[in-house]
């Protein structure tokens, strides 16, 4: 089939949706499908106003406009998008959306208006905004008009199911991972030293990086001096706040190396012991899945998407509060044999979210979208 991938953001931006949409495009190409992407993100050299760039073999229509802070918004895009979708002979559209995705929502209005079969994947937790969305009614209307709805995890799908109402199927289309790329094998016997904690995240309030450092400080107090080392990978607007906390509290065992490449990320995970995922509103947690694929036990929050690939007490810990996370960290710092057991379990059982499977699930969503339009 010929697929139009529609997303506010795309490479060269490097957020979760951007990278997942790019990787999905690659997987669809490998399956023999034809793929083009449409985005409100400028190209690497500033391309916009509909210019087409090619990223790893995929034509990317840059329907970006000049906006403050290069926001991925273009109120003038729908007319041109409609023309390109009609002339392009697409079989199905796949919209990638978050809590606020004005370009993606404009795209959905266009595809629904054209009668183009449309799949829509939600990469966010809707619980907090579901009442407002319910009043606005647009999500329910799209579902009623045949948009095949999905979310990236069961916890993300549940509020969406309540929003669209009984009788409407909401699927789960998880984020995908290249297991072979992330698996590093058995690291061998661990060298003595502090429990090496790692996280990779955007340093923004929603991801709670400052709260993470504070709870790890509490864990260190429980486990004893020299028991922990924390590396926080990533950049974002809260970096200054986190740096001040580290400096003011004398936490010389907390490191903030910034953003790193995928290759360096994999190497850093392999050299660590435990991955931490403190966000409450994590709809999936692709970085945590990558770390789990390397072998790391993951400590995450109940009610987040981490529960899709972490079972409490089996290959990681799933906790209900920051205090409980601090206790779990301290417990593992005192019990290296338990860390090794969880790591061995992760290495022996690769995650189910392998890209080859996820790509087939995406194609199944496209087939469902076609069936809903023909119904």
Model-derived regions, located:
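Short alpha-helical donor nucleotide-sugar binding micro-motif in glycosyltransferases
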Residues: 259-260, 267-272
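Short hydrophobic beta-strand element within catalytic cores of glycosyltransferases
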Residues: 297-300
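Nucleotide-activated donor-binding/catalytic signature segment of Leloir-type glycosyltransferases, i.e.
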Residues: 243-260
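Carbohydrate-associated surface elements
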Residues: 155, 176
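Aromatic "clamp/platform" in nucleotide-sugar-dependent glycosyltransferases that forms part
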Residues: 280
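Conserved donor-binding/catalytic core segment of Leloir-type glycosyltransferases
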Residues: 188-217, 231
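Conserved acidic donor-binding segment of nucleotide-sugar-dependent glycosyltransferases
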Residues: 312-323, 331-336
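A short, well-ordered alpha-helix in the C-terminal region of glycosyltransferases
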Residues: 338-352
């Amino acid at each position: 089939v010929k697929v139009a991938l529609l997303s506010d953001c795309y490479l060269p931006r490097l957020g979760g949706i951007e990278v997942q949409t790019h990787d999905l495009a690659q997987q669809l190409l490998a399956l023999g499908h034809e793929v083009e992407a449409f985005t409100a993100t400028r190209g690497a050299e500033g391309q916009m106003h509909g210019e087409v760039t090619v990223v790893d073999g995929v034509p990317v229509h840059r329907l970006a406009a000049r906006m403050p802070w290069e926001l991925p918004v273009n109120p003038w895009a729908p007319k041109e998008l409609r023309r390109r979708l009609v002339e392009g002979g697409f079989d199905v559209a796949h919209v990638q959306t978050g809590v606020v995705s004005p370009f993606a929502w404009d795209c959905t209005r266009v595809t629904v208006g054209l009668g183009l079969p449309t799949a829509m994947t939600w990469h966010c937790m809707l619980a907090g905004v579901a009442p407002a969305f319910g009043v606005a009614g647009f999500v329910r209307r799209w579902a009623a008009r045949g948009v095949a709805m999905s979310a990236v995890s069961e916890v993300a799908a549940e509020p969406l199911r309540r929003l669209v109402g009984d009788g409407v199927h909401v699927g789960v289309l998880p984020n995908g991972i290249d297991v072979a790329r992330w698996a590093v094998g058995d690291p061998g016997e661990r060298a003595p030293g502090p429990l090496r904690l790692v996280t990779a995240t955007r340093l923004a309030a929603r991801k709670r990086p400052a709260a993470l450092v504070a709870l790890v400080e509490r864990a260190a107090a429980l486990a004893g001096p020299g028991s922990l080392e924390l590396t926080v990978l990533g950049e974002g607007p809260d970096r200054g706040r986190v740096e001040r906390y580290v400096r003011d509290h004398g936490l010389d065992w907390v490191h903030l190396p910034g953003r790193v490449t995928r290759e360096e990320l994999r190497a850093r995970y392999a050299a660590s012991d435990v991955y931490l995922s403190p966000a409450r509103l994590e709809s999936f947690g692709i970085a945590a899945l990558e770390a789990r694929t390397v072998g790391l036990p993951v400590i995450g929050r109940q009610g987040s998407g981490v529960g899709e690939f972490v079972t409490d007490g089996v290959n990681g810990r799933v906790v209900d509060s920051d205090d409980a996370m601090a206790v779990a960290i301290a417990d593992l710092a005192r019990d290296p044999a338990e860390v090794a057991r969880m790591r061995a379990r992760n290495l022996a059982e690769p995650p189910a979210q392998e890209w080859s499977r996820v790509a087939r699930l995406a194609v199944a969503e496209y087939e469902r979208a076609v069936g809903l339009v023909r119904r």
